[in-house]
Amino acid sequence: MIGGEEDVVRHLDPLFKTIAPGVDGAPRTPTRSGSGTTAEDGYLHCGPAGAGHFVKMVHNGIEYGIMAAYAEGLNVLHRANVGKADQEVDAETAPLQDPEYYQYDLDVPEIAELWRRGSVVASWLLDLTAAALAESPDLEGFGGRVSDSGEGRWTIRAAIDEGVPVPVLSASLYERFTSRGEAMYADRLLSAMRKQFGGHAEKVAAGS
Protein backbone atom coordinates (compact mmCIF):
# COMPACT_ATOMS: atom_id res chain seq x y z
CA MET A 1 0.00 0.00 0.00
CA ILE A 2 2.12 2.79 -1.39
CA GLY A 3 1.49 6.50 -1.81
CA GLY A 4 3.71 8.92 -3.68
CA GLU A 5 4.56 10.56 -6.98
CA GLU A 6 4.35 8.29 -10.02
CA ASP A 7 7.99 8.67 -11.10
CA VAL A 8 9.31 8.14 -7.57
CA VAL A 9 7.26 5.00 -7.08
CA ARG A 10 8.33 3.70 -10.49
CA HIS A 11 11.97 4.28 -9.58
CA LEU A 12 11.52 2.33 -6.33
CA ASP A 13 9.49 -0.45 -7.94
CA PRO A 14 12.34 -3.03 -7.86
CA LEU A 15 12.59 -2.54 -4.09
CA PHE A 16 8.84 -2.95 -3.57
CA LYS A 17 8.79 -6.04 -5.78
CA THR A 18 11.65 -7.60 -3.84
CA ILE A 19 10.06 -7.22 -0.40
CA ALA A 20 6.49 -8.04 -1.52
CA PRO A 21 5.14 -11.58 -0.96
CA GLY A 22 4.89 -12.22 -4.71
CA VAL A 23 2.30 -14.07 -6.77
CA ASP A 24 2.69 -17.18 -4.64
CA GLY A 25 1.24 -15.32 -1.66
CA ALA A 26 -2.27 -16.37 -2.69
CA PRO A 27 -3.98 -18.19 -5.58
CA ARG A 28 -5.05 -15.94 -8.43
CA THR A 29 -8.60 -14.60 -8.21
CA PRO A 30 -10.53 -16.83 -10.66
CA THR A 31 -12.37 -13.95 -12.34
CA ARG A 32 -9.21 -11.97 -13.10
CA SER A 33 -7.86 -12.16 -16.62
CA GLY A 34 -4.99 -10.75 -18.62
CA SER A 35 -1.49 -10.06 -17.39
CA GLY A 36 -0.92 -9.72 -13.68
CA THR A 37 -0.75 -6.40 -11.86
CA THR A 38 1.46 -5.38 -8.96
CA ALA A 39 -1.48 -6.07 -6.63
CA GLU A 40 -1.09 -9.74 -7.53
CA ASP A 41 2.55 -9.48 -6.50
CA GLY A 42 1.46 -8.09 -3.14
CA TYR A 43 1.99 -4.34 -3.50
CA LEU A 44 0.12 -1.44 -5.09
CA HIS A 45 0.68 2.23 -5.87
CA CYS A 46 -2.59 3.54 -4.44
CA GLY A 47 -2.19 7.20 -5.43
CA PRO A 48 -0.41 10.38 -4.34
CA ALA A 49 1.33 10.86 -1.01
CA GLY A 50 -0.95 9.74 1.81
CA ALA A 51 -3.03 7.34 -0.30
CA GLY A 52 -1.12 4.28 0.89
CA HIS A 53 -1.57 5.25 4.53
CA PHE A 54 -5.28 5.88 3.92
CA VAL A 55 -5.75 2.40 2.42
CA LYS A 56 -3.81 0.82 5.30
CA MET A 57 -5.91 2.76 7.81
CA VAL A 58 -9.14 1.35 6.37
CA HIS A 59 -7.54 -2.12 6.21
CA ASN A 60 -6.93 -1.95 9.96
CA GLY A 61 -10.43 -0.63 10.60
CA ILE A 62 -11.82 -3.66 8.77
CA GLU A 63 -9.53 -5.83 10.89
CA TYR A 64 -11.25 -4.49 14.03
CA GLY A 65 -14.62 -5.56 12.64
CA ILE A 66 -13.48 -9.03 11.61
CA MET A 67 -11.85 -9.67 14.98
CA ALA A 68 -15.01 -8.56 16.79
CA ALA A 69 -17.18 -10.82 14.61
CA TYR A 70 -15.03 -13.87 15.38
CA ALA A 71 -15.00 -13.07 19.10
CA GLU A 72 -18.77 -12.54 19.28
CA GLY A 73 -19.64 -15.62 17.22
CA LEU A 74 -17.33 -17.91 19.17
CA ASN A 75 -18.74 -16.52 22.41
CA VAL A 76 -22.23 -17.60 21.28
CA LEU A 77 -20.82 -21.11 20.80
CA HIS A 78 -19.04 -20.94 24.17
CA ARG A 79 -22.35 -20.13 25.90
CA ALA A 80 -24.39 -22.75 24.03
CA ASN A 81 -24.78 -24.83 27.22
CA VAL A 82 -26.55 -22.05 29.13
CA GLY A 83 -29.74 -24.13 29.18
CA LYS A 84 -28.09 -26.59 31.57
CA ALA A 85 -27.64 -23.96 34.27
CA ASP A 86 -30.26 -23.29 36.92
CA GLN A 87 -32.41 -20.44 35.67
CA GLU A 88 -33.23 -17.69 38.12
CA VAL A 89 -36.33 -15.67 37.33
CA ASP A 90 -36.02 -12.15 38.66
CA ALA A 91 -36.26 -8.54 37.59
CA GLU A 92 -32.67 -8.50 36.41
CA THR A 93 -32.74 -11.05 33.63
CA ALA A 94 -35.50 -12.34 31.41
CA PRO A 95 -35.76 -16.13 31.79
CA LEU A 96 -34.36 -18.32 29.04
CA GLN A 97 -37.43 -19.15 27.00
CA ASP A 98 -36.33 -22.50 25.54
CA PRO A 99 -33.50 -23.90 27.68
CA GLU A 100 -33.76 -27.25 25.92
CA TYR A 101 -32.28 -25.61 22.82
CA TYR A 102 -29.11 -24.60 24.66
CA GLN A 103 -27.70 -27.88 25.94
CA TYR A 104 -24.57 -28.05 23.79
CA ASP A 105 -21.10 -28.46 25.30
CA LEU A 106 -19.27 -27.35 22.18
CA ASP A 107 -15.53 -27.68 21.66
CA VAL A 108 -14.81 -24.13 20.52
CA PRO A 109 -11.09 -24.69 19.75
CA GLU A 110 -11.99 -27.61 17.47
CA ILE A 111 -14.71 -25.59 15.75
CA ALA A 112 -12.22 -22.79 15.08
CA GLU A 113 -9.84 -25.38 13.63
CA LEU A 114 -12.64 -26.78 11.46
CA TRP A 115 -13.66 -23.36 10.16
CA ARG A 116 -10.14 -22.43 9.08
CA ARG A 117 -10.06 -25.42 6.73
CA GLY A 118 -12.05 -24.36 3.68
CA SER A 119 -14.89 -22.51 5.44
CA VAL A 120 -16.28 -19.30 3.96
CA VAL A 121 -15.08 -17.45 7.08
CA ALA A 122 -11.53 -18.85 6.84
CA SER A 123 -8.75 -16.26 7.04
CA TRP A 124 -5.33 -15.65 8.51
CA LEU A 125 -7.02 -14.00 11.50
CA LEU A 126 -9.01 -17.19 12.04
CA ASP A 127 -5.75 -19.16 11.81
CA LEU A 128 -4.41 -17.03 14.66
CA THR A 129 -7.65 -17.43 16.61
CA ALA A 130 -7.46 -21.21 16.29
CA ALA A 131 -3.82 -21.12 17.43
CA ALA A 132 -4.70 -19.03 20.49
CA LEU A 133 -7.54 -21.39 21.46
CA ALA A 134 -5.34 -24.45 20.95
CA GLU A 135 -2.79 -22.95 23.35
CA SER A 136 -5.36 -21.89 25.94
CA PRO A 137 -8.95 -23.12 25.42
CA ASP A 138 -10.15 -21.16 28.46
CA LEU A 139 -8.05 -18.11 27.50
CA GLU A 140 -6.45 -18.02 30.93
CA GLY A 141 -3.99 -15.19 31.20
CA PHE A 142 -6.16 -12.78 29.22
CA GLY A 143 -8.20 -10.26 31.17
CA GLY A 144 -10.19 -9.04 28.19
CA ARG A 145 -8.78 -5.52 28.07
CA VAL A 146 -8.41 -4.68 24.37
CA SER A 147 -6.32 -1.74 23.19
CA ASP A 148 -6.90 0.30 20.04
CA SER A 149 -3.91 1.75 18.26
CA GLY A 150 -5.72 4.56 16.47
CA GLU A 151 -6.50 3.26 12.99
CA GLY A 152 -10.05 2.26 13.92
CA ARG A 153 -10.78 5.77 15.20
CA TRP A 154 -9.25 7.37 12.11
CA THR A 155 -11.29 5.12 9.81
CA ILE A 156 -14.52 6.09 11.54
CA ARG A 157 -13.61 9.79 11.41
CA ALA A 158 -12.96 9.44 7.68
CA ALA A 159 -16.30 7.68 7.24
CA ILE A 160 -18.08 10.52 9.05
CA ASP A 161 -16.33 13.08 6.83
CA GLU A 162 -17.36 11.08 3.74
CA GLY A 163 -20.91 10.53 4.98
CA VAL A 164 -20.43 6.76 4.80
CA PRO A 165 -22.15 4.51 7.38
CA VAL A 166 -19.79 2.06 9.11
CA PRO A 167 -21.90 0.53 11.91
CA VAL A 168 -19.86 -2.67 12.18
CA LEU A 169 -16.53 -0.87 12.41
CA SER A 170 -17.95 1.64 14.90
CA ALA A 171 -19.39 -1.10 17.11
CA SER A 172 -16.08 -2.98 17.11
CA LEU A 173 -14.22 0.14 18.27
CA TYR A 174 -16.79 0.91 20.97
CA GLU A 175 -16.50 -2.67 22.23
CA ARG A 176 -12.78 -2.06 22.77
CA PHE A 177 -13.64 1.03 24.81
CA THR A 178 -16.07 -1.07 26.87
CA SER A 179 -13.42 -3.74 27.45
CA ARG A 180 -11.25 -1.11 29.14
CA GLY A 181 -13.98 -0.01 31.54
CA GLU A 182 -14.88 3.17 29.66
CA ALA A 183 -18.59 2.28 29.95
CA MET A 184 -18.42 1.65 33.70
CA TYR A 185 -19.86 5.03 34.68
CA ALA A 186 -22.73 4.68 32.20
CA ASP A 187 -23.48 1.14 33.42
CA ARG A 188 -23.53 2.30 37.03
CA LEU A 189 -25.82 5.17 36.09
CA LEU A 190 -28.20 2.77 34.32
CA SER A 191 -28.31 0.64 37.47
CA ALA A 192 -28.99 3.76 39.56
CA MET A 193 -31.85 4.80 37.27
CA ARG A 194 -33.48 1.36 37.55
CA LYS A 195 -33.36 1.65 41.32
CA GLN A 196 -34.92 5.12 41.17
CA PHE A 197 -37.86 4.28 38.94
CA GLY A 198 -38.55 0.70 40.01
CA GLY A 199 -36.71 0.10 43.25
CA HIS A 200 -34.60 -2.56 41.55
CA ALA A 201 -31.66 -3.49 43.76
CA GLU A 202 -28.48 -4.31 41.91
CA LYS A 203 -27.73 -8.02 41.96
CA VAL A 204 -24.27 -8.93 43.24
CA ALA A 205 -22.30 -10.85 40.65
CA ALA A 206 -21.40 -14.43 41.52
CA GLY A 207 -17.99 -14.67 43.14
CA SER A 208 -17.98 -11.01 44.23
Task: Please tell me what each predicted stretch does.
Residues E63:
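Gly/Ser/Thr-rich loops at beta-strand to alpha-helix junctions
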Residues R10, K17, V23-K56, M67-S208:
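NAD(P)-dependent Rossmann-like dehydrogenase/reductase catalytic/cofactor-binding core
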Residues M1-E5:
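Short beta-strand-to-turn element immediately C-terminal to the catalytic PLP-Schiff-base lysine
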